[in-house]
């Protein structure tokens, strides 16, 4: 796949379980806005979160922090009125439009819904795992372990989705 813009939660979760590199197996270029960097690196380091240091290292090499331009900020200012989105999600969606990035990596339901309205394809942390499996970057067993690790690290999914994900993993060749 081509380029994608990421929100904070997938970065945090993947870094926590030591699988941030999965993103590189799916996307050629990954971008984040300043608000996401502030949340995952600056605030994370202030809280002494190990994942913050992992993500910071990636932002120096293969994850590209890119500011949202004033022009795009003005054009998509209506996103700022959506109280269900945090600043990182708003900036990330604007950055998708600015870069013509077809993919938005996010787990938040509202942010994914808004992405679809903007003709951006949302993909969550579980979707990244499934895509990595389909690309042959990981095995079925690794995919199962990643899903379990993500849940242990704070990914919230209901039983129905969990079963569906395991079925998809099992049926993947």
Residue ranges and their predicted role:
Residues 106:
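Short beta-strand and adjacent tight-turn residues that come in two discontinuous sequence segments
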Residues 112-173:
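Acidic, PIN/NYN-like endoribonuclease modules and their adjacent C-terminal/linker elements
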């Amino acid at each position: 796949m081509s380029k994608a813009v990421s929100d904070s939660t997938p970065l945090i979760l993947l870094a926590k379980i030591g699988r941030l590199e999965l993103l590189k197996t799916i996307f050629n270029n990954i971008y984040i806005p300043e608000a996401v960097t502030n949340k995952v690196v600056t605030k994370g380091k202030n809280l002494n979160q190990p994942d913050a240091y992992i993500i910071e290292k990636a932002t120096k090499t293969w994850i590209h922090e890119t500011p949202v331009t004033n022009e795009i900020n003005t054009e998509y200012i209506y996103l700022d009125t959506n109280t269900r989105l945090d600043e990182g999600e708003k900036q990330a969606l604007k950055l998708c439009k600015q870069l013509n990035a077809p993919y938005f990596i996010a787990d938040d339901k509202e942010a994914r819904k808004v992405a679809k309205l903007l003709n951006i394809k949302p993909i969550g942390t579980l979707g990244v795992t499934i895509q990595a499996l389909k690309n042959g970057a990981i095995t079925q067993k690794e995919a199962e372990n990643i899903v379990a690790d993500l849940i242990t690290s704070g990914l919230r999914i209901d039983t129905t989705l969990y079963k569906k994900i395991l079925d998809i993993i099992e049926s993947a060749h």
